[in-house]
Amino acid sequence: MAKTSWKVKANRAPKFKVRAYTRCQLCGRSHSVLRKFRICRICFRVLAHQGRIPGIKKASW
């Protein structure tokens, strides 16, 4: 889990736009965040398996 201070810092508008970075809305992870859902790959996988993300299902071929 990310520190609360990191989550607060990520929500603030940066002084320059290029300094902005994505952070998972659920756990605060900064790496591997899916922009469309604003959550990390780990949280995405858990929520997808639970069926809590509409339109997403496990691939099978």
Curated annotation (Swiss-Prot):
It holds the Pfam family Ribosomal_S14. One of its GO terms (molecular function) is zinc ion binding. The keyword Zinc applies. This is Small ribosomal subunit protein uS14. Part of the 30S ribosomal subunit. Contacts proteins S3 and S10. Its cofactor is Zn(2+). GO terms for biological process: translation. Binds 16S rRNA, required for the assembly of 30S particles and may also be responsible for determining the conformation of the 16S rRNA at the A site. Zn(2+) binds at C24, C27, C40, C43.
